[in-house]
Amino acid sequence: MEANRSRLLAAARPYIQIYSIFGLTPPIQFFTRTLHKRRRGIVILGYACYLISISLMVIYECYANIVALQKDIHKFHAEDSSKVMGNTQKVLVVAMFVWNQLNILLNFRRLARIYDDIADLEIDLNNASSGFVGQRHWWRFRFRLALSVGLWIVLLVGLTPRFTLVALGPYLHWTNKVLTEIILIMLQLKCTEYCVFVLLIYELILRGRHILQQISVELEGNQSRDSVQELCVALKRNQLLAGRIWGLVNEVSLYFTLSLTLLFLYNELTILQIVNWALIKSVNPNECCQYRRVGTCLLLSINIFLSCLYSEFCIQTYNSISRVLHQMYCLSAAEDYLILKMGLREYSLQMEHLKLIFTCGGLFDINLKFFGGMVVTLFGYIIILVQFKIQFFAQSNFMQNINSTELKAYTA
């Protein structure tokens, strides 16, 4: 993969470099053909050692956070679901980072194919649109990427410490708090990495649809036999490109399957844990973290929402290709030329068969419907948790009243 032969990958390169610094994805230089073989091996070995050191740091910090959690639980006498959820939360963090390193190792070739497919598709789409007017400009994608992902990364990095630093509690050393904040940011950046690839696919779909719309315009204005034959060739080429984009979506979904599954599970469990501790500490009149907890819940929810929203954009744009084909099918040229009519029918059948789905290994689809279902499920668990806590507090107060009554009777 040569990043300089793809303007889309060149626009996404700064974001990929950020993710590689945090150990989330290999540096894009690993996939270039200009790097000397021996030097490339040394760089890969050095980066592997860097990833191992990150994993060791994550394991140590999770251990330190578990120790601090036990002290918090003992202080507030909350040895119920809080301990289970807290320990599960920390184990999920370790699992995500360990799997991320394994994913880099096991799916290195798949990621290389994804980069190659993106670059090849961009070149082929540019070649296919060379005979038409009104081509899309690459700088629009750079602006969309900065607005959709770059701005959110800035907000994540800036707001995560502000919302979560105080909530880490008094039992962690300041160095542990700083490293924990870095780990929390790294976790959420994995979702933005997925968003970058989704937006790359979205741009490819937009270009493919734009070419199809130009073919439709040409069919309306020019219906000579030679022109229609040339447009049928362009239509077939566009059909093949749409099929390749569908295959690219499957590759990206497979690459992010377990990473996103663990991240979504972690975010949902973290929101439940935040609500749990908000209920536990609600009896404290000096509690100052309630609004920050709301901010943390919003950050985690918006991070999932954006990945679902951008995936939904891709799906809706891909599905709009069928509407363009239907409009072309209604043109008089489709009635006059059988080859065009058969080409449109074949393309339409392909679109019906190759449905665009962003999925996590078949466990769930990443779209707005999934996000809505996740929110409803999360609210259901929160209601159950609140009911459980109210019952627990009522029993605790009742037992305290009985003990105080017995103590007064005994002293009397």
Curated annotation (Swiss-Prot):
User: Glycosylated where?
Assistant: 403
The UniProt entry, under PANTHER family, shows:
GUSTATORY AND ODORANT RECEPTOR 63A-RELATED (PTHR21143:SF131), INVERTEBRATE GUSTATORY RECEPTOR (PTHR21143)
Question: What transmembrane ranges does the database entry give?
Answer: 8-28, 41-61, 149-169, 182-202, 245-265, 295-315, 370-390
- Membrane topology reported for the UniProt record: Multi-pass membrane protein
Task: Tell me the residue ranges located in the Cytoplasmic compartment per UniProt.
Answer: 1-7, 62-148, 203-244, 316-369
Per the entry, what this protein does is: Probable gustatory receptor which mediates acceptance or avoidance behavior, depending on its substrates.
Query: Coiled-coil region(s) at which residues?
Result: none
Q: Which UniProt keywords apply?
A: Cell membrane, Glycoprotein, Membrane, Receptor, Transducer, Transmembrane, Transmembrane helix
Q: What is this protein called?
A: Putative gustatory receptor 98d
Q: Which residues lie on this side of the membrane: Extracellular?
A: 29-40, 170-181, 266-294, 391-412
Among the GO biological process terms of this entry, one is: sensory perception of taste
Single GO molecular-function term? ligand-gated monoatomic ion channel activity
Give all cystine bridges in this chain. Answer: none
Instruction: Give yes or no: UniProt keyword Heme.
Output: no
Principal location class: membrane
